[in-house]
Amino acid sequence: MTVTQEASPKRESLHIIDDRTGSYYSIPIVNNAINASDFKKVTAPEDKAYPANQTENGLRVYDPGYSNTAVSHSKITYIDGLKGTIQYRGYSINDIVGRKTFIDTAHLLIWGHWPSTAEAETLQQRLDQVPVPQDFVFNVIKSFPRDGSLMGMVIAGLSALQSSDMNAIPAHVGKTIYLNNPELADQQIIRVMANMSMLTAAAYCHHIGRDFTPPRAGLSYIENFLLMTGHVEAATGLPNPRYVNAIERLWVLIADHEMTCSTAALLQTASALPDVISCMVSAISALYGPLHGGAIEVAYKNIESIGSISNVPAKIARVKAGKERLYGYGHRVYRVTDPRFVFIREILNELSEEVEKDPLLKVAFEVDRVASEDEYFTSRNLRPNADLFAAFVYKALGFPPEFILPLSILSRTQGFMAHWREAMGNPPRIWRPGQIYTGDLNKSMDE
């Protein structure tokens, strides 16, 4: 049953008595949220002892890490961390995975509805028509050492691509371009989607010393990516359909994940109204961190460091003693098993022939078994998330561990584009969070 937000929700409010002044305030509650700006009404006389508290300017809300702060309204993705559910535009991923293609899901996220057959064909045609980047863009990637940062190659490639169309940069043309201009925003979305796939493939080919194969019209987004990276069958020159199907489902699962650290970084940058490539660079840089997207590569290396099943108990003991961290377990949002985890295990089961070649997966399964039965983990609601096994899907498909994160970013590009497009349709307001100054005041240069 479709549930829609009430047009006129009942009036609710938070009542505050400030014991500093005895003043009473009523702050409206809408969608189980209060407007932080309403606290500016809660003022007090200047704090003479420490003026930096700015009591006369209104009460501030301190929330390090944004653990309980909503910074925007969005209609794209809904996550219920207590129930372990994810919905894209109101559709459960349980109903989407295996029934809709990745490109259909991208259309849903970005444009708000499932594409008709004609719309899906048009989207694929527009992607096919995006030209291969100019040679200087590829040369930037090739200037890196082959064993250099793959993430750095992608970021550098994007930066070079940005310079190939200076008229797409608002600061260069001296005006805002994309705000409330969905047609122009959509052109950039198509440009980024196509080029992210090509640049990521180019970085991979440079890394392993393989020639880059240009995309081919008539192939799907994922088929073309596998073609560009050289992951094709000798007999047909085309990607293995089983591998295409595995990536289709995996990328549907991780196409968007609401207000993540990287999405917030993208939107923080977008609030200043630059071009979309600048926003993507911000998002990718945030994803590189081991507490965010980098966790997928770290989770694999964490399992790799264990080495064998016999070493699992010692690893668990070190984690419980606080000496080490078990990446791939626990999540900022979920208090139950990550809903994507179940589907990823299904994908791995279907790739059993390839998976058997990776003995580390048996170690990962043993870690999962031991942790799921250990009171230390169960009492803290530390359950496996998608990071733990997603890496093994890519490994089974023939990609090295160091390419896991670039693959993850490519799969998330469509989600980033959805959030950027939504932001460009909202009233402009630069994100400029405050701080609580706790340092010294009024020092003398003579002291």
Curated annotation (Swiss-Prot):
One Pfam family cited in the UniProt record for this chain: Citrate_synt
GO biological process, one term: tricarboxylic acid cycle
Taxonomy of the source species: Eukaryota, Fungi, Dikarya, Ascomycota, Pezizomycotina
Species in which this protein is naturally found: Aspergillus oryzae (strain ATCC 42149 / RIB 40)
Protein's name according to its UniProt entry: Citrate synthase-like protein oryE
Listed GO MF terms: acyltransferase activity, acyl groups converted into alkyl on transfer
Pathway participation: Secondary metabolite biosynthesis
Residues forming the catalytic site: 331, 387
Domain of life per record: Eukaryota
Keyword vocabulary terms for this entry: Transferase
Function: Citrate synthase-like protein; part of the gene cluster that mediates the biosynthesis of oryzines, natural products with an unusual maleidride backbone. The two subunits of the fungal fatty acid synthase oryfasA and oryfasB probably form octenoic acid. This fatty acid is most likely activated by the acyl-CoA ligase oryP to give octenyl-CoA before the citrate synthase-like protein oryE catalyzes condensation with oxaloacetate to form tricarboxylic acid.
EC number: 2.3.3.-
Similarity remark: Belongs to the citrate synthase family.
EC top class, as a word: transferase
InterPro entries, A to Z: Citrate_synth-like_lrg_a-sub (IPR016142), Citrate_synth-like_sm_a-sub (IPR016143), Citrate_synthase (IPR002020), Citrate_synthase_AS (IPR019810), Citrate_synthase_bac-typ (IPR024176), Citrate_synthase_sf (IPR036969)
